[in-house]
Every structure is written in C-alpha cells, then in structure tokens.
C-alpha cells in the first residue's frame, strides 16, 4: 500500500483512494481537484458530470496563462475557466473507487465529504516530433499522481437551551431616549 501525504483525522470514519502515473494533464487536474476539495461527495460527482456536459466550468486560478474567460466562472469569483473533460473523467473514476471503499468499510456514503485531495506531478513521458530540415523536437506529456481521502461528516449536536433568555443589548442612545420618554409620562 502506498503512502499518503496526509493521514485522516478519524481513520475509522475515513476511506482513501489513489492513482499513480495517470496520463492526464497535471495543470488541468490540479485546478479541477482544487475546486472539488471540501465538497460533499454527491455534489462533487454532480459537479464533475456538469463539467463534462459544459454546464459548470472549472475556475483556473494558478495555471491560468492563456485561459479564456467564461461567464460560468463568475459563480467562483473569477473570470477564467475551462471544461477539462479528461481530468473530470479521471477524478470521477477515483471518487467512485473511494466511494466503493467507503461502502466496503460500512460508512454512510451520503454523509461523505472530500477531506483531502492532492495532485502531484509524475515523471514526464518523452516522445518526439519531426520538424523541418531533419530536426527532432521533444514532445513531452505531464502525467500526475492523485490521492483522495473521504471522511464522514460529523453530526452537529445542538446546544441545550437555557431557561432564561438572553437580554437584548440596547445602545446608550436608545436607553437615554427610553428614560426621557418615561420622565415625560
């Protein structure tokens, strides 16, 4: 079993999945993974399917040189965005793998949240392209490693109510007006 860069906070309520040397662009995958980080699992799967159908875009924040603008990026507070279909496919496969791992461990799949997702660069693959005058240039690819940790969301426990209600704070101005009103009557 490979090492993960981070251990889950509660290992009994978490599950992991990872992929190594995946033939998908690192930069696109990093931006897509950053977008779905901390999302509930159901929302992340829906988002990635929407990206494939170009209904929602992935905002490009770091690797955004030459990236065009789109109106769908406004909901993320930026102007540049794309629809990286292959990255969405790979992340969907990984999330489905992690979900089946969670199901195997007996976790509630409806309460899963993406606690940690990380994309690292893998060794570049070298090919060649033939140029004019007998020259050869490199034709490199940028694969990546992806790891994801899903955790069950903790249930929020409501505080017990106290018997006496909290006193409403009144500003000095309003207090002075109220006293003035009482003196007039």
Swiss-Prot record:
Entry-linked Gene3D superfamilies: Ribosomal protein L22/L17
InterPro entries assigned: Ribosomal_uL22 (IPR001063), Ribosomal_uL22_CS (IPR018260), Ribosomal_uL22_euk/arc (IPR005721), Ribosomal_uL22_sf (IPR036394)
Transmembrane segments: none
Keywords assigned by UniProt, alphabetized: Ribonucleoprotein, Ribosomal protein
UniProt GO molecular function: structural constituent of ribosome
Pfam family, one: Ribosomal_L22
GO biological process: cytoplasmic translation
Positions with biased composition (Basic residues): 167-176
Keyword Ribosomal protein annotated: yes
Keyword Ribosomal protein: yes
Domain of life: Eukaryota
UniProt xrefs under PANTHER family: 60S RIBOSOMAL PROTEIN L17
Similarity annotation: Belongs to the universal ribosomal protein uL22 family.
Protein name: Large ribosomal subunit protein uL22
Classification of source organism: Eukaryota, Metazoa, Ecdysozoa, Arthropoda, Hexapoda
